[in-house]
Amino acid sequence: MARKVIALAFLLLLTISLSKSNAARVIKYNGGESGGGGGGGGGGGGGGNGSGSGSGYGYNYGKGGGQSGGGQGSGGGGGGGGGGSNGSGSGSGYGYGYGQGNGGAQGQGSGGGGGGGGGGGGGGSGQGSGSGYGYGYGKGGGGGGGGGGDGGGGGGGGSAYVGRHE
């Protein structure tokens, strides 16, 4: 009987200890660093074609008394080749930030377009495109940061979208 009581007491203490460490882990998680996108490739020379694309995604989450950082993602496009070649590139970025409780959140995303190829002795053409998306959300005592995004194309167009702000 004594062994059963000791075993039950040990299990109870272990359960309480684990639940406390899990709660602390949730509160301490205040948003990490977000990753950036990759860059595109370069084109070939002498009548060759070159194209590249890159994209990035960032996500951050904060809960409790913590403050979440801004999610940030970006991608750069590729450049074209020389000597009568064509070059194209595209880039896109997405960022998301979320804060709950006393924390604020902000999201930011950006993407830059690629540059076109130049003609060395021959004609060359280039095009690029870029897009960005940002989202910010805050709940409880914290204010949500503004979502911001921007994108610019090298030789091409760019677009920007601002996400929800609460």
Swiss-Prot record:
InterPro entries: GRP1/2
The protein's role, per its UniProt record: Responsible for plasticity of the cell wall.
Signal peptide per UniProt: 1-23
Compositionally biased region (Gly residues): 144-160
Name under which the protein is recorded: Putative glycine-rich cell wall structural protein 1
Compartments, record wording: Secreted, Cell wall
Annotated spans, Disordered: 105-125, 144-166
Protein's gene: GRP-1
